[in-house]
From Swiss-Prot:
The gene is glpK2. Its EC number is 2.7.1.30. This is Glycerol kinase 2. Glycerol binds at residues 81-82, 133, 242-243. It catalyses: glycerol + ATP = sn-glycerol 3-phosphate + ADP + H(+). ATP binds at residues 11-13, 264, 307, 311, 408. ADP binds at residues 11, 15, 264, 307, 408, 412.
Length: 496
């Protein structure tokens, strides 16, 4: 029997998961690595540590599954997106640490681009807003600030890659320098309509084309692992950014299908098919994946603070000792007691885009209890999700019929039920919650014929529980309009 190995390289840990042909988890190994903060607002990783931790867990996962490397039909890769690595082509050594997606050091470069009026130019071509989050300005920073790198880049002696590219390059012993459409679409230098690096943006940021990887479909045999790694050559056949991989793992193959990943923040992606919709509400237009000679697009909305607000209840207010308690506490009261919580700890993302908004708790009376505060925090996750779903429907003109969910918080039945109630559509929780790794496995398996087609994959998707909306529409709209009112009071607070 054959299996698929998924390498899930995340922001805080490297993971490897072995899946069988039914999409079930056979083994799973995780290893955390260092977060490096050289200055306030700067975040780095050591690329060598990323590679070493990833290969260590890969070998362990095969061992723990009780199988041999030759039993692996293909390897799929999924990764933290936007994080930028530049390395020497000849020695394979990084010229600088990986600059992580969270790193804000290039904000001044972004401000300058915006001041010069390039926002629309960048958005039309890349589907993105100008922000330090994306790879483009990070590459420029390395070229401008690390001695000797620019000269080498002009000669094609250094290479750029997002994390997937770095892993594939190392897995193939330096033979293959590629990325996929989904990861390329997060760099801010890739034209998502022409499906190529954008020469005018490269000129604007002064990035030599010679250092960039070849862009390929997300399901494709890119190359084979070097023999000295696993003792056999295994095809590397799937590659997608983490959020896009989760959309694929949730089998959201039809336009209008939508998933929400509940983590520290939330990421909503809606499949929009072969059409790239331009957002009027500050959502990102991104590539979902490239497969079978076609490219599929998605709208993406990110919510900064969701699970992080629950962590704040635990570590900041110390009114809970773990996240699991929140469900029981929230259900001890019949409603939120008029309390609303806006988790604008770092401003608000889509659709408000207000960096000066700050958190608030409003509606407090003498009768307010710990339970009401906890419930208000959980409810805020659902309200923020509705904020994004509403603008997605408006931008795409597609009505959402169901929401598929994954991530840590989906075990909270109260939250899932309230999410269905406040959206007015069913929420579907799958049996396999490892949707990101599963998506990468599916992409790899499809490329080597391990799975036949997307129909087969859609049939493997198993429902754990479906939450039907049970709230009447008057109550739903009453709560939601109160939420909107609470948000309006948090906006611009830092500047007032």
């Amino acid at each position: 029997m054959k299996y698929v190995l998924s390498l899930d390289q995340g922001t805080t840990s490297s993971r490897a998961i072995v899946f069988d042909e039914k999409g079930n988890v056979v083994s799973k190994v995780n290893k955390e690595f260092r977060q490096i903060y050289p200055r306030p607002g700067w975040v780095e990783h050591d690329p060598v540590e990323i590679w070493e931790s990833q290969i260590e867990v890969a070998k362990k996962a095969i061992e723990e599954a009780g199988i041999k490397p030759e039993d692996i039909a293909a390897i799929g890769i999924t990764n933290q997106r936007e994080t930028t690595i530049v390395w020497d082509k000849n020695t394979g050594k990084p010229v600088y640490n990986a600059i992580v997606w969270q790193c804000r050091r290039t904000a001044p470069i972004c401000d300058e681009l915006k001041e010069k009026g390039y926002s629309e130019f960048i958005r039309e071509r890349t589907g993105l807003v100008i922000d330090a989050y994306f790879s483009g300005t990070k590459i420029k920073w390395i070229l401008d600030n690390v001695e000797g790198v620019r000269e080498k880049a002009e000669k094609g002696e250094v290479l750029f890659g997002t994390v997937d590219t770095w892993l594939i390059w190392n897995l193939t012993g330096g033979r293959v320098h590629v990325t996929d459409y989904s990861n390329a679409s997060r760099t801010m230098i890739f034209n998502i309509h022409k499906l190529d690096w954008d020469d005018e943006i490269l000129e604007l940021l002064n990035i030599p084309r010679a250092m960039l990887p070849q862009v390929m479909p997300s399901s494709h045999v890119y190359g084979y692992t070097a023999k000295d790694i696993f003792g056999v050559e295994i095809p590397i056949a799937g590659d997608a950014g983490d959020q896009q991989a989760a959309l694929f793992g949730q089998a959201c193959f039809q336009p209008g299908m939508l998933k929400n990943t509940y983590g520290t923040g939330c990421f909503l992606l809606m499949n929009t098919g072969e059409k790239a919709f331009e957002s009027k509400s500050g959502l990102l237009t991104t590539i979902a994946w490239g497969i079978n000679g076609k490219v599929y697009y998605a709208l993406e909305g990110s919510i900064f603070i969701t699970g992080a607000a629950v962590q704040w209840l635990r570590d900041g207010l110390k009114i809970i000792s773990n996240a699991a308690e929140t469900e029981e506490l929230a259900t001890k009261v019949p409603d939120n007691g008029g309390v609303f919580f806006v988790p604008a700890f770092v401003g608000l993302g889509a659709p408000y885009w207000d960096m000066y908004a700050r958190g608030l708790i409003i509606g407090i009376t003498r009768g307010t209890t710990r339970e009401h505060i906890v419930r208000a925090v959980l409810e805020s996750i659902a309200y923020q999700t509705r904020d994004v779903v509403e603008v997605m429907e408006k931008d795409s003109d597609i009505k959402v019929e169901t929401l598929r969910v994954d991530g840590g918080a989906v075990v909270n039945n109260f939250l899932m039920q309230f999410q269905a109630d406040i959206l007015g559509v069913p929420v579907e929780r799958p049996v396999v919650n490892e949707t990101t790794a599963l998506g990468a496995a599916y992409l790899a398996g499809l490329a080597v014929g391990y799975w036949k087609d997307q129909e087969e994959i859609a049939s493997l998707w198993q429902l754990d529980r479906r939450f039907e909306p049970s709230m009447n529409s008057e109550e739903r709209e009453r709560l939601y309009s109160k939420w909107k009112e609470a948000v309006s009071r948090s906006l611009g607070w830092e500047k007032r």
